[in-house]
Amino acid sequence: MPGNSGAAPLPALEPHADLQALNTFGLPARADRLAIVEHPAQLAALLAQPDWAGAPRLVLGGGSNLVLTGDFHGLVLKVAIGGRRLVGDDDDAWYVEAGAGENWHDFVRWTLAQGWPGLENLSLIPGTVGAAPIQNIGAYGLEVAERFASLAVVSLETGASFRLEAADCRFGYRDSIFKHELAGRTLVTSVTFRLPKRWLPVIRYADVAEELAARGSVAPGPIDVSDAVIAIRRRKLPDPAAIGNVGSFFKNPVIDAATLGRLVAGHPDLPHYLQPDGSVKLAAGWLIDRCGWKGRDLGPVGVYERQALVLVNRGGATGTDVRRIAQAIRDDVSRRFGVDLEPEPVFV
């Protein structure tokens, strides 16, 4: 893993850089300058340059959780810090570190190939390792926070490097401190995961259980679970390389018991899931589908016909188009159910 010590040359700065290929929605936008950061020391050297002392900065990983609404007048930092290694173990877990620029899915499959299970439910999620804790990505009964040990970051304000433990990150549902107090103020350079030696499969979702059964997996191992999740995701979700999208566009809303009672009275078939804290999680895709949006377009952006949670670029869409259909969907769901949908991606 690249360290933070030693001299490193400044990364090349590309002026008036095209960002369309760097965001999975395929939205057109340009940046005043684009820097590809392959080593933490490059970042420190760049931040020391007076030309960029007060300039707006945007950290870009895989561009899979981003809606670009126009040109970015500042410096875009594309994270390309690589490397992955076992950094230690104890009686309970292996500790595995990866550079923030590593492809998330490739990293997950690599850990499984090494015999270090624990991330299999998060297979095929687009994006980079560094973005995973920022969003606290999750799928099929598991969140990154449950396998997280620590991360290394660089302050974009001072250039100082420091490490954050799990409690420091304030993880929540698709949430972390990086979306609040530290939003736009840091760049993650590496992440260390805690992968359990006493592994048990997480098969709480019916889709996963049914897929494993169809494959004849009576006592599934980690790779079996990963393969099942990959198959499910490929059936339900479009490949960003073929159809522009950012995966699930809306968070599943969390409500209280009183709101649930009101909703179930009018919609007895409403899917809902009780949470450990007594709150109730709803299926945003079901709400969107009931409002008639599944498979429907508004201009060049549409709701994917196989999964109502996903918005897709039908061709030539802009960030303004995405914002328009997202707001229209939110308005319809609010009018019909009295529930507010919150977008997952960040609008810039």
From Swiss-Prot:
It is found in: Cytoplasm. It catalyses: UDP-N-acetyl-alpha-D-muramate + NADP(+) = UDP-N-acetyl-3-O-(1-carboxyvinyl)-alpha-D-glucosamine + NADPH + H(+). Residues 27-198 form the FAD-binding PCMH-type domain. One of its GO terms (cellular component) is cytosol. Its cofactor is FAD. It comes from the Bacteria. InterPro entries: FAD-bd_PCMH (IPR016166), FAD-bd_PCMH-like_sf (IPR036318), FAD-bd_PCMH_sub1 (IPR016167), FAD-bd_PCMH_sub2 (IPR016169), MurB (IPR003170), MurB_C (IPR011601), MurB_C_sf (IPR036635), Oxid_FAD_bind_N (IPR006094). Keywords: Cell cycle, Cell division, Cell shape, Cell wall biogenesis/degradation, Cytoplasm, FAD, Flavoprotein, NADP, Oxidoreductase, Peptidoglycan synthesis. Pathway: Cell wall biogenesis; peptidoglycan biosynthesis. One of its GO terms (molecular function) is FAD binding. Cell wall formation. HAMAP family: MurB. This is UDP-N-acetylenolpyruvoylglucosamine reductase. It comes from Aromatoleum aromaticum (strain DSM 19018 / LMG 30748 / EbN1) (Azoarcus sp. (strain EbN1)).
